[in-house]
């Protein structure tokens, strides 16, 4: 046929059997990729430290999505929360991966069957004897079935009526686990961070889909609407399908990047805005202040801060710190976190507590500034010693650690103080193992960043695809040159104003 590569899909334009075949093959490829990727990730995933080396630090992409839907155990005998599991059951990580691969194989065989047996009676219009599809009816069927699936997920899986529930956690990502949810039917259900909204919205959207599907199955579109929207053209289906996909891709890119109940930080890592707003730092200080108010010592209060919470408050876990084209997991960047050294508190020789100004997200280097409680700069690490007024040596800065591995250890040596001041720019200080993975020390993004970038990019691409195919189907007759009014519109002298049919010249 000699088609260029970008026009090869024309071969299924008027061939419903093979159109179905290529879609089944596409499903086979998607399911096969998902299952294979899951097995690869399970082969390289280390579940030994869910606090300091969670799945998102290791660059896992499909494991978080399985976990979000209620899969937490492996046939390897481990669970996502740590410890050993004796009876993981059929629906383990490996079980889900295997089911996807088996489904992929069945779809592969079905695609071959439909490619070979393309000339089925069901695809022919009995009145004309030509191949045709009742597209409005097919739309109704798909809408009804997707509504049933949507309703079933919300009413059974998420609520635990028949299923495990989904991953639910507290606002600081500390106590997450899979649990059933009650639907949130009030205004709170519209809060993107309220998990109950997932159940209620799926139930509501599923109900709407079922009703809309039944409507489209029982009511035929008016003739003018059918012709106006080109409902008989398969490219109309392509255009509107692309619209649905790009809209969904934009939505999930937003919920992933900005955070929501559907993208828990325990599974996908923190968002960049939690670093920008000092979200975890504020919670840590709130807990410390509460402990000090109960007459606990600094050492006692900081020792009670969960290592998991401290780890979130580290810039290396900010998905916006890794460049989009730096391949590899976060562990391949700054290394595998081994332990929290503790919280450093800096003081000058007058006993004032000093706070290190934290590095903003989009800086690679940042001056080391130590400010007091009023925000006044009291010390720094100068670029030029000759002009320094606030150097660590001149101000007499010391550092003491509370909590973590260096609990109650203090340093007054200027070189050591400056080392920890530089590291405090990056949030809480952790010991990082760079040797095991030969980590290069350059920050990487988390799966949250990769997912967002991929979906936003493809959404933009698909947006243009929607415009392209929508224009092709709406103006098909014009592009093909078969519009009955086309000749008259461009004929010189036919209209007083070129192309305006209201100004047609009258024959004398």
UniProtKB/Swiss-Prot annotation:
Highest taxon in the source lineage: Eukaryota
GO-annotated biological processes: photosynthetic electron transport in photosystem II
Pfam families linked to this entry: PSII
Any one Gene Ontology cellular component term annotated for this protein: thylakoid membrane
Subunit structure: PSII is composed of 1 copy each of membrane proteins PsbA, PsbB, PsbC, PsbD, PsbE, PsbF, PsbH, PsbI, PsbJ, PsbK, PsbL, PsbM, PsbT, PsbX, PsbY, PsbZ, Psb30/Ycf12, at least 3 peripheral proteins of the oxygen-evolving complex and a large number of cofactors. It forms dimeric complexes.
An annotated Gene Ontology molecular function: electron transporter, transferring electrons within the cyclic electron transport pathway of photosynthesis activity
Gene: psbB
Keyword annotations from UniProtKB, A to Z: Chlorophyll, Chromophore, Membrane, Photosynthesis, Photosystem II, Plastid, Transmembrane, Transmembrane helix
Localization: Plastid membrane
Protein name as annotated: Photosystem II CP47 reaction center protein
Protein family membership: Belongs to the PsbB/PsbC family. PsbB subfamily.
Native source species: Cuscuta exaltata
